[in-house]
């Protein structure tokens, strides 16, 4: 069976909540990276067999592939696996290619958390009289547990307590992430992966081509921030990921197709995994997902040259580092979501793309990307360049 390869990819800069990308919808962000990734792959839009894209907050947003100029005959599907949506899109693309059901698939994710609407649950039937309720789509379908209504961060706080991670440890991890991201931005490490996006403002058209939040952060304030999820808690806005806007796409095909059509290969997908446990334990689910993907790849922890473990909360990345003996210096080498942000439907493909370019810059070969998913799940991908 021919291996599955990634032949191109791109992402937008990560925009802050109500920040630089706030005037663009998720499909507009998605269209930018779909269009750019197809162009970078050196294929024509009509050669694409399917677009598989993640998006969590999809109420009323429309379609990205149409805005990207992909022809009408190309199929498309939207994936909602919460924070794992974009990585699941990549996993589904890989499986579809393995089955021989397609030759070229664009996979990734998009999210404009800024533009997530508010919902009127009883509007269709009529409120008749009395007080009504407006629900926040972002909270209801993105940041809250479906069964209990608790915020995801409250579960992270519980697990941080269970694992004994202190405020100082999590703040130090977040500060390290922020410093790495700031260095990556100032040194231009992200330039290859980012597609500039034009945004219309009152002053004219502005080009957004740099992650918005890391250079705005004040390192000195991090230890002074109030707990976010409990009065005496240790998790804060700084050692958590920030609400963000962005998109990332990858073009996948088989190694055989790439070779026969003269396409350059960025990376090969060596193995994938999905893991689930109790919903309250989603923050440590990446540990088992990583173990599974390493077993399937036939790799040891020490053989992996670089890791992208999504920092939904600092403790999510810290847990596998401690449990599996991962060298922290190899994790999120250009910073993670505590610094860059976490547009929930896009992060899964963003971290794969960033991992590819980190390996490329470092002259290394093997990498693993993993993230936690609300509901108790996690996914992981092992790649080789």
Task: List where the protein language model places each region.
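Conserved active-site "lid/cap" helical segment
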Residues: 1-68, 75, 155-167, 177, ...
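N-terminal extracellular/periplasmic Venus flytrap/periplasmic-binding protein-like
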Residues: 10-12, 23-32, 40, 169-260, ...
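Condensing-enzyme catalytic core mediating Claisen C-C bond formation in acyl metabolism
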Residues: 1-27, 36, 219-284, 288, ...
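Active-site pocket-lining segment
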Residues: 52-53, 155-157, 193, 200, ...
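Active-site-proximal alpha-helical scaffold in enzymes
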Residues: 79-111, 160-189, 249-256, 321, ...
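Conserved catalytic cysteine-centered active-site region
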Residues: 55-104, 146-151, 216-242, 323-350, ...
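Flexible glycine-/small-residue-enriched beta->alpha junction loops
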Residues: 104-159
């Amino acid at each position: 069976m021919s291996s599955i390869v990634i032949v191109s990819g791109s992402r937008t800069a990560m925009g802050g909540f109500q920040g630089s990308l706030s005037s663009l919808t998720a499909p507009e962000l998605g269209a930018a990276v779909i269009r750019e990734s197809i162009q970078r792959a050196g294929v024509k839009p009509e050669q694409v067999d399917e677009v598989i894209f993640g998006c969590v907050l999809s109420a009323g947003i429309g379609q990205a592939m149409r805005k990207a100029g992909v022809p009408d005959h190309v199929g498309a599907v939207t994936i909602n696996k919460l924070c794992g949506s974009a990585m699941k899109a990549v996993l589904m693309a890989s499986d579809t290619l393995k089955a021989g059901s397609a030759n070229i698939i664009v996979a990734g994710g998009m999210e404009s958390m800024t533009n997530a609407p508010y919902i009127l649950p009883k509007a269709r039937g009529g409120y008749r009289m009395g007080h009504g309720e407006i629900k926040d789509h972002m909270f209801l379908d993105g940041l809250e547990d479906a069964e209990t209504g608790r915020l995801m961060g409250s579960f992270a706080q519980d697990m941080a307590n269970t694992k004994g991670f202190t405020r100082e440890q999590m703040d130090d991890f977040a500060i390290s992430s922020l410093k790495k991201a700031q260095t990556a931005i100032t040194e231009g490490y992200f330039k290859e992966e980012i597609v500039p996006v034009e945004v219309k403002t009152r002053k004219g058209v502005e080009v957004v081509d740099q992650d918005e939040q890391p250079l705005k952060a004040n390192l000195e304030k991090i230890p002074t921030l109030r707990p976010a999820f409990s009065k005496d808690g240790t998790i804060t806005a700084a050692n958590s990921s920030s609400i963000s806007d962005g998109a990332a796409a990858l073009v996948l095909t088989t190694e055989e197709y790439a070779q026969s059509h003269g396409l350059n290969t960025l990376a090969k997908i060596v193995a994938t995994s999905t893991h689930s446990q109790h919903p309250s334990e989603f923050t440590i689910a990446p540990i088992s997902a990583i173990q599974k993907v390493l077993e399937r790849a036939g790799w040891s922890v020490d053989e992996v040259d670089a890791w992208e473990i999504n920092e939904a909360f600092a403790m999510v990345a810290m847990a596998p580092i401690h449990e599996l003996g991962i060298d922290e210096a190899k994790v999120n080498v250009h910073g993670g979501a505590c610094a860059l942000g976490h547009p929930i439907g896009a992060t899964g493909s963003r971290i794969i793309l960033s991992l590819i370019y980190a390996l490329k810059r470092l002259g290394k070969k093997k990498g693993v990307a993993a993230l936690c998913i609300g509901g108790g799940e996690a996914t992981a991908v092992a790649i080789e360049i």
